[in-house]
Amino acid sequence: MKTKRTRSSFRSMNSERKLESIFLFVTGKCNDKCAMCFYANDMAKKEKDLTFEEIRKISETAGEINKLWVSGGEPTLREDLPEIFEMFYRNNQIKDVNMPTNGLKPDRVIEWVKRFRTNCPDCN
């Protein structure tokens, strides 16, 4: 099966070297209409977001990763985002997380950053 062959190739590549970064588009949802957004024209398409299980499979097969970039739409609209961060920390030894946000949910971001700093202390 093509998928198994791809996963096998991906695993062997990662056994030899570490990925610098992975970019994860966690949601197509957004609570704003920013003029400069690269995704604004595609928001109306209502494509399905990756499930947590699909993201878990990515994490389990990716090997060690230096930086995790999460984007979207608006990443803070994804309720399971803290679990996604923690999973990549455990499975992939990420050292940095980068997440652009429109800043419309500051209390949620502050809560998540505190949780992340507690559960993933050596990650920025």
Where are these regions (language model features)?
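Conserved alpha-helical substructure of the radical SAM core
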Residues: 2-123
